[in-house]
A protein has these predicted regions:
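ABC ATPase NBD coupling module
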Residues: 5, 17-33, 38, 62-66, ...
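Short coil-to-helix segment of the ABC ATPase nucleotide-binding domain corresponding to the Q-loop/switch region
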Residues: 45-52
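Catalytic Walker B motif of ABC-type/P-loop ATPase nucleotide-binding domains
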Residues: 110-114
Length: 227
């Protein structure tokens, strides 16, 4: 996402070398969104102000900010907490706000770091639904997480990384059949039925056409890195 300079290799997005681009440039020009594991809301601002602040940074005018803010509040079902201080929200409410704020710039790719950390099981299902809806809109999603059981339900392809090396990659079923992955990460999971994944709690409105992403990520793919 641009926070750490790679030791080697290059990062391409839509055939553009973005290896040396800082995070803000990747977001504004490259269409890349990033959600860190740590809570990133502006605690002293309201839910609504958190969204508006990002829109101002992007240079949106007042009318654009109002329309986009109302749209995101409704899409993520956080209208009822629009004036609540972000620091007082529950873990799940903060996570929905963070994802909504990440979408302000209409990214083509979203990178999620441990999106299920610190939230209750019901909210986990809600976030799974949100991720599924984003994928269906044509947004590529790259997830780094240790919550294998939750993540394997929603990823199209998974990469398991151990000691800096790719241990294996494939579909959920291919991952759970890998002996070394089972031993190190999955324990007694015998199979994995993605059809059992929770249905989305709500749908996100499609804005314009679907987008495509480069750097090896297919359109509408959700990837997982179990490091």
């Amino acid at each position: 996402c641009g926070m750490i300079e790679p030791d080697k290799g290059q990062v391409f997005l839509n055939e553009q070398d973005v290896t040396q681009w800082p995070m803000y440039r990747r977001a504004r020009e490259g269409g890349m969104g990033y959600l860190p594991q740590q809570t990133s809301v502006f605690a002293k601002l309201s839910t609504e102000q958190n969204l508006l602040a990002m829109m101002e940074l992007l240079g949106m005018n007042r009318r654009q900010r109002k329309l986009r803010c109302e749209e995101l509040l409704e899409q993520f079902r956080i209208t009822h907490i629009r004036r609540s201080k972000a620091g007082k929200l529950s873990g799940g409410e903060k996570r929905r706000l963070e994802i909504a704020r990440c979408l302000v710039s209409n990214p083509e790719i979203i990178m999620l770091d441990e999106p299920f950390a610190g939230i209750d099981p019901v909210t986990v299902q809600s976030i799974q639904g949100i991720i599924g809806d984003l994928r269906d809109r044509g947004i590529s999603i790259l997830i780094t997480d240790h919550a294998a059981r939750e993540i394997l339900q929603i990823t199209d392809r998974t990469y398991v990384i151990s000691e800096g090396q790719v241990l294996c990659s494939g579909t959920a079923e291919e991952i759970v059949r890998h002996d070394e992955v089972r031993e190190k990460y999955l324990g007694d999971i015998d199979s994995f039925d993605q059809s059992a994944a929770p249905a989305p709690h709500f749908s996100l409105t499609q804005q314009g056409g679907t987008t495509s992403a480069g750097s090896g990520l297919r359109r509408r793919r959700t990837d997982l890195d179990l490091s």
